[in-house]
Curated annotation (Swiss-Prot):
Belongs to the FMN-dependent alpha-hydroxy acid dehydrogenase family. The gene is lctO. Its EC number is 1.1.3.-. Residues 21-375 form the FMN hydroxy acid dehydrogenase domain. Catalyzes the oxidation of (S)-lactate (L-lactate) to pyruvate, with a reduction of O2 to H2O2. Is likely involved in the L-lactate aerobic metabolism of S.iniae that enables the bacterium to utilize L-lactate as an energy source for growth under aerobic conditions in the absence (or at low concentrations) of glucose. Keywords: Flavoprotein, FMN, Oxidoreductase. This is L-lactate oxidase. Induction: Induced during growth on L-lactate. Repressed by glucose. Homotetramer. FMN binds at residues 99-101, 128, 150, 178, 246, 301-305, 325. It catalyses: (S)-lactate + O2 = pyruvate + H2O2. The active site is at 270 (proton acceptor). Binds 1 FMN per subunit. Its cofactor is FMN.
Length: 403
């Protein structure tokens, strides 16, 4: 028998969130998060912003961007360009939208508003299986803008085939198979808040007919837990679409995905929402990128809050960098305009970093060498890290200091 808290009738749930649409005045996305907390209902904000367990991994995701950026001058750089062409799609930036469930938790217009904002910015929109808006409406809003879909795989192959048929009919270009969320993480904030989804999930209604009023644990139990490489093979074969495997955090899992026919690897730890105590996603990126060795594209998310974070991810092997929570905060505060502004803000920061680092193009960024932070205790000591720092004490005197 289902838990009583999982049986709440959707009609009994009172839910009122933001209906904002317009320009938002904010300095950075950390400020934007504080602003959004005031307009998103407590339970919904807790679901969006919190992480698993003690939130160690959630905070490590941001802290991990500890590599040093060495400025470079005299490089002839002016007005750096973030524009790229990714598998035939011209993008304003390698910054894309990560799949985030239930946009209507943050704004009444939900995925329609976020899709409009992403389209106006000019990048890839990734729809979540747990979207609160159906596929045709999102596709219509996006028009010819690139549209990806994040797939939570059902236990029923017939339902999976039907969803894939719909994806092809709606012009979705790639499938992102999530493999790191076969069960729900220990989200204690949701438990304290008694959070249940106040809105339905039309895309997966065949295997989750009553998404509204359900806990996250219930939602995850409706999906297939025993995912294997055979599922990757089947999705690629049946859909004929590129399949990005979302969740590898080590070389072994990346290799397993490639062996199964993955067209790309999406490095993430689900924003620290699943396994607390795991490594920061940025630390995992470097290992995975080295093992993949540019055989397929790499997408990265988790902890990205600054343009310099995007720069460092690209310099560490990512081809695309995805934003999640910050976009939802922009959606809450300004609808489609707020969504677009978040991308513009971080992209402007990226351009500034590119200028100061002496990189004219995104390809230049990918060849930029980061310097490890020698004071970071999380990086094991190596003779290669044993450097000499030059200290000027007075004119014409240089002293060598070891560290």
């Amino acid at each position: 028998m289902e838990n009583k808290s999982e049986m709440i009738n959707a009609t009994t749930i009172e839910f009122k969130t933001s209906s904002a649409e317009g320009s938002v005045d904010f300095v950075n996305v950390f400020d934007l998060e504080k602003m959004a907390q005031k307009v998103i209902p407590k339970g919904a904000f807790g679901y969006i912003a919190s992480g698993a367990g003690d939130t160690f991994t959630l905070h490590e995701n941001i802290r991990s961007f500890n590599h040093k950026l060495i400025p470079h001058g005299l490089k002839g750089v002016e007005n750096p360009s973030t524009e790229i062409t990714f598998i035939g799609d011209k993008l304003a930036s390698p910054i894309i939208l990560a799949p985030v469930a239930a946009h209507k938790l943050a704004n009444e217009q939900g995925e329609i508003a976020s899709a409009k904002g992403v389209k106006e910015f000019g990048t890839i929109y990734t729809t979540s299986s747990y979207s609160t808006t159906d596929l045709p409406e999102i596709s219509q809003t996006l028009g010819d803008s690139p549209h990806w879909f994040q797939f939570y795989y059902s236990k029923d192959d017939g339902i999976n085939r039907h969803i894939m048929d719909r994806l092809k009919a709606e012009g979705v270009k790639s499938i992102v198979l999530t493999v790191d969320a076969t069960v729900g993480g220990n989200r204690e904030v949701d438990k304290r808040n008694g959070f249940v989804f106040p809105v339905g999930m039309p895309i997966v209604q065949e295997y989750l007919p009553n998404g509204a009023g359900k806990t996250m644990d219930y939602v995850y139990k409706a999906t297939k837990q025993a995912l294997s490489p055979k599922d990757v093979e089947y999705i690629a074969q049946y859909s004929g679409l590129p399949v990005y495997v979302k969740g590898p955090q080590c070389a072994e899992d990346a290799f397993r995905a490639l062996e199964a026919g993955a067209s790309g690897i999406w490095v993430t730890n689900h924003g620290g929402r699943q396994l607390d105590g795991g490594p920061a996603a940025f630390d995992s990126l470097q290992e995975v990128a080295e093992s993949v060795d540019r055989r397929v594209p790499i997408v990265f998310d988790s902890g990205v809050r600054r343009g310099q974070h995007v720069f460092k991810a690209l310099a560490s092997g990512a081809d695309l960098v995805a934003l999640g929570r910050p976009v939802i905060y922009g959606l809450a505060m300004g609808g489609s305009v707020g969504t677009r502004q978040v991308f513009e803000k971080i992209n402007d920061e990226l351009k500034m970093v590119m200028q100061l680092a002496g990189t004219q193009t995104i390809d230049d960024v990918k060849h930029f060498k980061l310097r490890h932070n020698p004071y970071d205790s999380s990086i094991p000591f190596s003779p290669k890290c044993f450097k000499i720092r030059l200290i000027f004490r007075r004119p014409n005197q240089i002293l060598g200091q070891f560290f």
